[in-house]
Each structure stands twice: as structure tokens, then as C-alpha cells.
């Protein structure tokens, strides 16, 4: 089923993925006190776009926890390849949370839990109640959650991935994305995968055997498969079996974290226009403040 704008009950925004994009897109933005505010501007610009595009939806923004998660305990090098958050981005996080809340949009961030796992759990709870959910993200991993009730919006584009589009884009059905990453790894998250197994080989193996588990159940058949360096692939799968399943686990988004998130807690609230206006003036967002005074900036807020 295609989810159209009018029947998207919940729009779950992967705030962390937008935070970095906004920061680098507006790196030179500063306020009256010469403090950086590009990430603030970029996040607000994105949120306003979403409010305009999805006026009938309840929007929720989800952020990563700064603390380590279970994945860091499973695999110490997990995401170790990423640079530390710049200090001038850190300074903008609290103001971003502040203004989002005053707009009336709920924020969820849970200690020691990644945004992906919060989104996975929340989306699963909501679709079991027959709601339609759209996840807005720049992260390909979240495509594994796609089903008849959950679709993924790529960034601020109009590209929405349903089950058929996920298969077309990645070559496999949504639920097999962790298996794919278990084999080929994921450089962006420092997930190792199996050495010498690239995307093309991983897709052939998954299409032939159906899942990572079935690949290992039929591993003796691999030398006879019509793939390049089949013997090497066979040997590496044998040698790095634990690494393959560890990588799959690292790439699998949790849908059952123990957290009490009710629909009441994620309901949008009326915006506080006085606080928003003061915020806009503080950060020199004068055009936005003018639109706010005219009732145009928040015209689609509940």
C-alpha cells in the first residue's frame, strides 16, 4: 500500500542524521553574538519543510544518545571511524531541542540507545495499532523497517521507499538488509562483514540461499556457485562465520527496546509563538520572524 501525505499518521524524523547535514550545509552561519547557528537554521528549515508537506501528520523527532550503546559493547570498533562531534555543533544541540519543543514537536532521546532503535521500536508499536508511519532519514539502515504500514522518506526529497522500491534500490527485500550488511559490512558504521565479500557477491548469495543463516546451512554448495573466487568466498565464510553473524546483529535495528512510549507522550502540542519569536530574533532569523508574525511560519502546526 502506498502511503500518501494525507494518511501518514506519524512522521518519525531521524534527528541525528539531519543534525550533521544541517551543520555542514550552513557552516558559516552565526548569530548576533558571533556564535555558530547553522545547524539550528538547517534543522528548523527541514522541520518547516516537513510541517508544510505533512500538515496532517503527528511529527516526532528522535535523537541519538551521546553515551555508548550495546553495539559498542558487542564490537568496540563500532563507529570508531567517525570523527568526534565538533564543539560548535555540540553548542547548538540544546538550543535545537529548546526550539523544537516550543514549536510543539515531541523529542525522544534515551540514554544508551541509538535513534535507529527508538525509531524501530516506536514504528513497530504504531504499525501494530494500524497507524501509517513515515520515517524521514538520510540513513539507509532504516529501510529494513519498511513494510505495508511503514515507509521511508529519503531526506527532504519526495522519494518514498515502499517494499518494492527498497527491493529495486538495494536488490533485496527490507528484512534482508541486515543479512546483506552482515556479509558485505558497512564502512559508515565500521561494521566489518566478511573479507572479500562485496555487495555483488552478497546479493548473489542471498538470492541463491535466501538468508545469512541459510547460506551457512548450505555452505558446502558455495564452491559450485557461479561466482568469482567461489573457493576464496567459501573459505572466508568458514573463517569469519562469527564475524558475519556479529555484523548482522550490529546492523539489525531493535524493534523491542524496553521503553514506555505512549501515543500521548508523542502527541504534538500547540506552539508557543512568543518563545519562537524571541528565539528567531536572538539568532537573526528575521525573515522567519516576519512570517511568524503574519501567521505563515507555523500555519500548518496543530
From Swiss-Prot:
Organismal lineage: Bacteria, Pseudomonadati, Pseudomonadota, Gammaproteobacteria, Enterobacterales
Under Enzyme Commission nomenclature, its number is 3.1.11.-
The UniProt entry, under Gene3D superfamilies, shows: 5' to 3' exonuclease, C-terminal subdomain, 5'-nuclease
State any single GO MF term. 5'-3' exonuclease activity
Keyword Nucleotide-binding part of the UniProt annotation: no
Q: What class of enzyme is it?
A: hydrolase
Q: Where is the 5'-3' exonuclease domain?
A: 173-269
Annotated organism of origin: Buchnera aphidicola subsp. Baizongia pistaciae (strain Bp)
Name of the protein described by the UniProt record: 5'-3' exonuclease
What does the UniProt keyword field contain? DNA-binding, Exonuclease, Hydrolase, Nuclease
Q: What does this protein do?
A: 5'-3' exonuclease acting preferentially on double-stranded DNA.
Per the record, the GO terms for biological process are: DNA replication, Okazaki fragment processing
- Keyword Zinc annotated: no
Pfam families in the cross-refs: 5_3_exonuc, 5_3_exonuc_N
Amino acid at each position: 500500500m502506498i502511503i500518501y501525505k494525507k494518511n501518514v499518521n506519524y512522521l518519525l524524523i531521524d534527528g541525528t542524521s539531519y543534525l550533521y547535514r544541517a551543520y555542514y550545509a550552513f557552516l558559516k552561519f552565526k548569530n548576533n553574538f558571533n556564535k555558530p547557528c547553522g545547524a539550528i537554521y538547517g534543522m528548523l528549515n527541514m522541520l518547516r519543510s516537513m510541517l508544510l508537506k505533512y500538515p496532517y501528520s503527528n511529527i516526532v523527532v528522535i535523537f541519538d544518545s551521546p553515551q555508548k550503546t550495546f553495539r559498542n559493547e558487542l564490537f568496540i570498533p563500532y563507529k570508531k571511524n567517525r570523527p568526534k562531534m565538533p564543539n560548535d555543533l555540540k553548542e547548538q544541540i540544546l538550543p535545537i531541542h529548546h526550539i523544537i519543543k516550543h514549536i510543539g514537536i515531541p523529542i525522544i532521546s534515551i540514554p544508551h540507545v541509538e535513534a535507529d532503535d527508538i525509531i524501530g521500536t516506536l514504528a513497530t508499536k504504531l504499525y501494530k495499532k494500524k497507524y501509517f508511519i513515515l520515517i524521514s532519514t538520510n540513513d539507509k539502515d532504516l529501510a529494513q523497517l519498511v513494510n505495508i504500514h511503514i515507509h521511508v522518506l529519503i531526506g527532504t526529497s519526495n522519494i518514498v521507499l515502499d517494499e518494492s522500491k527498497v527491493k529495486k534500490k538495494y536488490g533485496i527485500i527490507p528484512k534482508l538488509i541486515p543479512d546483506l550488511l552482515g556479509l558485505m559490512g558497512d564502512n559508515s558504521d565500521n561494521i566489518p562483514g566478511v573479507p572479500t565479500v562485496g555487495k555483488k557477491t552478497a546479493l548473489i548469495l542471498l538470492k541463491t540461499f535466501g538468508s545469512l543463516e541459510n547460506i551457512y546451512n548450505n555452505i558446502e554448495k558455495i564452491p559450485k556457485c557461479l561466482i568469482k573466487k567461489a573457493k576464496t568466498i567459501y573459505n572466508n565464510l568458514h573463517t569469519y562465520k562469527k564475524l558475519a553473524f556479529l555484523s548482522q546483529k550490529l546492523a539489525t535495528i531493535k524493534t523491542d527496546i524496553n521503553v514506555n512510549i505512549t501515543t500521548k507522550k508523542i502527541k504534538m502540542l500547540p506552539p508557543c509563538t512568543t518563545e519562537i519569536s524571541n528565539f528567531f530574533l536572538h539568532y537573526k532569523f528575521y525573515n522567519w520572524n516576519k512570517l511568524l508574525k503574519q501567521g505563515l511560519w507555523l500555519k500548518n502546526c496543530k
